[in-house]
Regions:
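Multi-pass alpha-helical transmembrane bundle typical of ion/small-solute transporters
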Residues: 2-250
């Protein structure tokens, strides 16, 4: 019986063994699928809004919704790219020496899948609401206001998920499994920790609504684009250093 079970035990041990290379392709695949699903949805949502043009609604209303939809998609792609680049850089530099690092990687990828689905749900619900209000003949101001404020709970949940993902990446970099890359891993740990903290603060954008305001401080898509722009400026030096490190390793 032990002889017959030996191949199965060897297979299970192989699956449980920590190996960074086993994660590389999976990481690329998960982030690519998330981006693809969101990209496929964009034309359908845009066409649903455009189909309401003959409802005698101001073209500026349709244009405003389409522009904000494009802003949200752009912000989403930038965030997914940033998550992917930090995740893969940390994994490539640190390697994996412990089973708990595999669990951390799995949690990050699971949140990526959930996040992509959550974004699609938010945009679908916003588009459906806008179509209903346009067909009902509501004013331009009401349509745009409801578009921005609709799905507040889902948007906050999305920001908190991103914060958790960056926090998990910080823990992954903190393991410093590769002693030759301690300096780079420390920089990545610090950056991901700061990003996690910033995304924990972003839900404060909706704080005025608790005190009677009808809108948040700013549309969340625009806030994330501003964050991305500032992030790219501040992290240019780190990116150059990591690029040189990866070139040297190859």
């Amino acid at each position: 019986m032990s002889a017959s079970n030996r191949p199965l035990r060897q297979l299970i041990q192989h699956l449980e063994s920590p190996n960074a290379e086993m994660w590389m392709g999976l990481i690329d695949g998960v982030y690519a699928v998330a981006m693809t699903l969101i990209a496929i949805e964009l034309p359908e949502l845009a066409s649903e809004v455009i189909d309401t043009i003959d409802k005698q609604v101001e073209i500026t209303t349709i244009s405003g919704i389409l522009i904000y939809e494009l802003i949200v998609y752009t912000a989403t792609f930038f965030i997914l790219y940033e998550l992917w680049s930090f995740h893969k850089s940390i994994l490539k530099l640190s390697g994996i020496r412990h089973i708990r690092q595999n669990l951390t990687n799995g949690l990050i990828l699971a949140l990526t899948c959930l996040g992509a689905g959550n974004i699609l749900l938010i945009l679908n619900s916003k588009t459906d609401l806008a179509s209903e209000e346009i067909n009902a003949g509501m004013s331009q101001a009401t349509i745009l206001k409801d578009w921005i404020t609709h799905g507040t709970a889902s948007s906050i949940c999305m920001l908190l998920m991103i914060a958790v993902m960056f926090g998990l990446m910080s823990l992954l970099a903190r393991s410093k499994a590769n002693p030759e890359q301690i300096a780079n891993l420390k920089a990545l740990e610090r950056n991901t920790r700061v990003k996690a903290f910033l995304f924990l603060l972003l839900p404060l954008n909706w704080l005025p609504m608790m005190f009677g305001s009808q809108t948040p401080i700013a549309p969340v898509g625009i806030m994330i684009l501003v964050y991305i722009a500032l992030s790219n400026i501040n992290e240019a030096k780190l990116r150059r250093r990591l690029s040189e490190t990866f070139k040297a390793s190859t």
